[in-house]
């Protein structure tokens, strides 16, 4: 949450969907104490699962573009501004994606010892073999709203929606 608040681009909306966690009151108070109208909190009384929660947030979103962040993720301070500087590419690309980094304190790095860093540049052949993206992309909100995550899948839900987007809207772009 704090990494979203630190973005160098200010016009965003953060939708937090708490899927029936035992510590929801603590999170709810944290969000209330932020007193930031850009941060929207929703608590589910019944656990509905990751795909349903992502779909719930997607459908709540009011913005023109959409990207995601999971509770164990952190964004670099310029994540949104970098994606937005490449938004014209969405005319011919299904979505944009970027490298993962490891954060230690305030230092972001790409350690060579971790096999998933850096991510591979897009190639259709490689993409059809495995998920080279990870779990978060940036694209127009309407694309997410048309595709949505498949709540019936038990694994690879992110890869599934990305494949469907590529088939429907064109290749993807690594930024």
Positions of PLM-derived features:
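The conserved acidic donor/metal-binding loop of glycosyltransferases
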Residues: 70-74, 99
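Conserved donor NDP-sugar-binding/catalytic core segment of glycosyltransferases
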Residues: 78-109
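Glycine-rich, basic loop-to-helix element that forms the pyrophosphate-binding segment
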Residues: 44-61
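Conserved donor sugar-nucleotide recognition element shared by glycan-biosynthetic enzymes
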Residues: 49-50, 54, 79, 132-135
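Acidic donor-binding segment of Leloir-type glycosyltransferases
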Residues: 3-43
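Short aromatic/hydrophobic "clamp" motif used to bind/position activated sugar donors
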Residues: 66
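Short alpha-helix within the catalytic core of nucleotide-sugar-dependent glycosyltransferases
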Residues: 1-2, 26-28, 55, 63, ...
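Conserved nucleotide-sugar donor-binding catalytic segment
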Residues: 116-174
């Amino acid at each position: 949450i704090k990494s979203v608040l630190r973005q160098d681009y200010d016009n965003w909306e953060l939708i937090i969907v708490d899927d029936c966690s035992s510590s929801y009151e603590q999170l709810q108070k944290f969000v209330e104490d932020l007193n930031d109208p850009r941060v929207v909190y929703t608590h589910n009384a019944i656990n509905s699962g990751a795909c349903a929660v992502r779909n719930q947030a997607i459908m709540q979103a009011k913005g023109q573009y959409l990207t995601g962040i999971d509770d164990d993720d952190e964004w670099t301070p310029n994540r949104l501004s970098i994606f937005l500087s490449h938004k014209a590419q969405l005319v011919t690309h299904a979505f944009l994606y970027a490298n993962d980094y490891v954060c230690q304190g305030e230092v972001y790095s790409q350690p060579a010892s971790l096999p998933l860093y850096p991510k591979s540049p897009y190639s259709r052949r490689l993409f059809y073999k495995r998920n080279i993206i990870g779990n978060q992309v940036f694209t127009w909100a309407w694309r997410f709203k048309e595709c949505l995550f498949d709540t019936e899948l038990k694994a690879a839900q992110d890869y599934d929606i990305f494949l469907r987007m590529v088939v429907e809207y064109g290749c993807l772009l690594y930024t």
